[in-house]
Regions:
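Small-residue-enriched alpha-helical segments and adjacent helix-cap loops
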Residues: 23-27, 49-195, 225, 316-447
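Generic secondary-structure signature for well-ordered alpha-helical cores
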Residues: 74, 78, 108-111, 152-156, ...
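Terminal amphipathic helices with adjacent charged low-complexity linkers/tails
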Residues: 93, 97-98, 105-110, 235-299, ...
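Short acidic (Asp/Glu) and glycine-rich catalytic loops that position anionic groups and cofactors
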Residues: 47-48, 126, 204-211, 239-246, ...
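N-terminal basic/disordered segments at the start of proteins
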Residues: 1-65, 174, 185, 189-192, ...
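Mobile "lid/hinge" segments at catalytic clefts and subdomain interfaces of large enzymes
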Residues: 2, 158-262, 437-494
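Long hydrophobic segments that form regular secondary structure
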Residues: 303-312, 318-344, 480, 484-496
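Short, flexible, solvent-exposed loop/turn segments with mixed acidic/basic and small polar residues
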Residues: 41-46, 77-83, 237-241, 302-307, ...
């Protein structure tokens, strides 16, 4: 075990002690969160159970890690696994002793939780199809993994004002959300020369902001200099006193964009003068053929790869919650088919890549009962209440109620978009960047406090056009399923 892992192992015993104090009400929710958040552990509502978030680097799931998660579900009788909106896995409803046991075992397998929460660099997001997507510029996977390694080697040393999110996209589709992160990179090329376009100081949640484009090309091998410069700027200019205004997006709002970019340049120059952070990775331009011979038709669960004859199957469980039994079925398939590769997405899905035609057919059949197939079925939702400590509304229940209403009334789902649902304004369900989004809250209506959701429309993410959704108003939670049903009928009439 290396020195860093030894430090992380020692932290687990401190978490164990703090967890028991919290359960016994000897320390507050805030005090416990201050200790546990940086370790990827949070108390659930009620104060007796806990959740753990694994730092599955950029969503890549090795066979060893798939097996490990499967074994955890069996040993600790975990019914469901949650795929998050940042390419990670969460396990819920665990006791603190079990949490600590899981962390120790995971550490032995290089599956980390450190930095899964708290004021640290979070999981580095990438396009889930990076390396196999038609039309991509180049595969960003190795660069993302190097950034993750760089972060993890220093994870216990960071003292940031708030969390820092980094994303890399392999094409202009911006599937990783580079244009809405603290630091984003999108693969590009000019005259056959690969480079990154860079974006700074964006983010979702309260007072969201689209990232600021950086007007210079970033050489792929130099990406760590730009990462380190942003960290240093964040430490120098971030707000350590007001948590509500501590994210990077508040810095250019305070300084002005021109001054912010000038300050960033100063930090970049200094980093380049003082450190050697060149990467020994070559960005190789991806090739997309003019013609392909795929026999299976594409749909929302099946994508043609740029490698002729190969497919990716997209498994989206309802609300990102996959039962442990269904997860095991997928894990067994991947273990039996060595060419298959699993990656988690930003949309609470698992992408199983590099499948030939026969393998794709088999996996589609295996997942048929639990794989959501239409856009509205593939809606996203954060965990919400009754699990989340800070959640206000039942986000997952809302999605279930919408689907039940549509199916009960035999309404066509064909024209409905996915809905992105957050249980509060924190945007864990990314409600601000979906075609339609909902954010939970409470509101007095007459003499009653009602369950309500703010409704947003028109959000989207891409290199050319990233838009934050417009808030239209607030709806009673009880009325939303019927509203979606009526919308479906109107869309069908207009053939949209």
């Amino acid at each position: 075990m290396n020195k860093q892992d030894e430090i992380l192992k020692l932290e687990i015993s401190k978490l164990h002690e703090a967890g028991h104090k919290f359960v016994n009400k000897e320390i507050s929710v805030g005090d416990f969160k201050g200790i546990s958040g940086g370790m990827g552990v949070y108390a659930q509502r009620g104060g007796q159970d806990f959740m753990i978030r694994f730092r599955t680097n950029s969503g890549l799931m090795s066979i060893d890690h798939l097996e490990l998660i499967k074994n955890f579900t069996e040993k600790y009788e975990i019914e469901d696994i949650h795929f998050t909106t940042r390419q990670a896995i969460q396990l819920h409803h665990l006791k603190i002793d079990d949490i600590c046991d899981i962390m120790e075992t995971a550490l032995e397998h290089k599956l980390y939780t450190r930095g899964g929460g708290g004021n640290y660099p979070r999981n580095v997001a990438i396009s889930p199809m990076s390396g196999v997507e038609k039309g991509e510029i180049f595969d960003v996977t190795e660069f993302a993994l190097k950034i993750s390694e760089y972060f993890m080697n220093r994870i216990t040393e960071y003292k940031l004002p708030r969390k820092l999110k980094v994303a890399l996209s392999s094409s202009d589709r911006d599937a990783a959300g580079a244009t809405i992160n603290d630091l984003g990179f999108i693969a590009a090329q000019e005259n056959g020369e690969p480079f990154f376009r860079m974006y700074l100081a964006g983010g979702l949640g309260n007072n969201p902001g689209i990232s600021i484009p950086y007007d210079k090309k970033v050489a792929p091998k130099e990406i760590l200099y730009y990462i380190e410069a942003m960290i240093n700027l964040f430490i120098a200019e971030g707000d350590y006193n007001n948590r509500a205004k501590a994210r990077t997006r508040y810095i250019p709002r305070r300084m002005g964009i021109a001054e912010f970019l000038a300050a960033y340049e100063k930090h970049l120059i200094k980093v380049k003068e003082e450190k050697n952070l060149d990467l020994d990775i070559k960005a190789v331009l991806s090739e997309t053929q003019e013609e392909y011979s795929h026999n299976l038709e594409e749909n929302l669960s099946l994508v043609h790869q740029r490698q002729d004859g190969l497919y990716t199957v997209i498994i989206h469980p309802l609300n990102g919650q996959i039962s442990s039994k269904d997860f095991e079925k997928v894990a067994v398939f991947i273990k039996e088919n060595k060419n298959a590769e699993a990656r988690l997405s930003m949309t609470e899905s698992m992408y199983v890549r590099n499948l030939n035609e026969e393998q794709a057919k088999v996996l589609l059949k295996i997942t048929d009962k639990f794989r959501q197939k239409t856009k509205i079925q593939q809606s996203m939702s954060c965990v919400g209440i009754p699990t989340c400590q800070i959640g206000i509304e039942q986000s997952q229940t809302l999605v279930k109620n919408i689907l039940e209403y549509i199916q009960k009334n035999n309404i066509s789902e064909e024209n409905l978009p996915s809905v992105y649902v957050s249980g509060c304004q924190n945007s864990c369900g990314r409600h601000q960047v979906g075609d339609m989004g909902f954010a939970g809250g409470k509101k007095r209506v007459g003499d009653k406090i009602e369950d309500v959701f703010d409704i947003y429309i028109g959000g989207m993410v891409s290199r050319e056009k990233t838009i934050l959704g417009t808030k239209l108003g607030t709806m009673l939670m009880s009325q939303i399923p019927e509203f979606i049903g009526e919308l479906a009928i109107e869309l069908e009439k207009s053939n949209m």
